[in-house]
């Protein structure tokens, strides 16, 4: 969930924040409202960080999904211009906004450090948790294996994502 939210902390650090919140809000609740206030403070301290984390993950997912069609179009345009898939990922990471730029930049760095392209893309899907992204990555993997016009496939996927988003809004 921490990666889904884009938070650069580990689970141990997050649990420390929860623990400190429980203690701090419990003490404050006791000082200002006796034992019942302490119980309320402990409860709030235990659940508030998870609620904030969940909300941040939801916002980030919505932001990435909102950028996905444009990101795929940037990659497709770069492929049409004759660039390799990695160069196209680099273009997307530079041209699009955060948080998608950071995620695609991370994929590119992982591949450059020796990670298999399919594995890096699958890790992206795991981190983000978007069904549309999973569909796009599956299309990329299939197209890379069987060959063909990846730019055309990405444009089709991007257009389909846009159409689905339009239907969701209605």
Please report, for each region that a protein language model flagged, where it lies by residue.
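Hydrophobic alpha-helical signal-anchor/transmembrane segments
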Residues: 1-73, 94, 129, 165, ...
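Glycine- and small-hydrophobic-enriched helix-loop-helix hairpins
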Residues: 70-167
């Amino acid at each position: 969930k921490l990666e889904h939210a884009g938070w650069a902390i580990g689970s141990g650090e997050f649990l420390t924040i929860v623990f400190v919140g429980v203690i701090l809000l419990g003490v404050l609740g006791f000082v200002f409202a006796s034992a019942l206030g302490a119980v309320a403070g402990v409860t709030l301290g235990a659940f508030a960080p998870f609620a904030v984390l969940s909300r941040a993950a939801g916002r980030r997912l919505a932001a990435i999904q909102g950028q996905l069609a444009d990101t795929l179009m940037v990659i497709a345009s770069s492929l049409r211009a004759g660039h390799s898939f990695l160069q196209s990922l680099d273009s997307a990471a530079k041209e699009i906004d955060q948080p998608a730029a950071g995620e695609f930049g991370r994929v590119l760095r992982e591949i450059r450090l020796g990670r298999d392209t399919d594995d890096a893309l699958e890790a992206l899907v795991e981190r983000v948790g978007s069904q549309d992204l999973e569909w796009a990555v599956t299309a990329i993997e299939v197209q890379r294996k069987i060959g063909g016009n990846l730019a055309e496939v990405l444009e089709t996927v991007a257009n389909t994502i846009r159409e689905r988003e339009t239907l969701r809004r209605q």
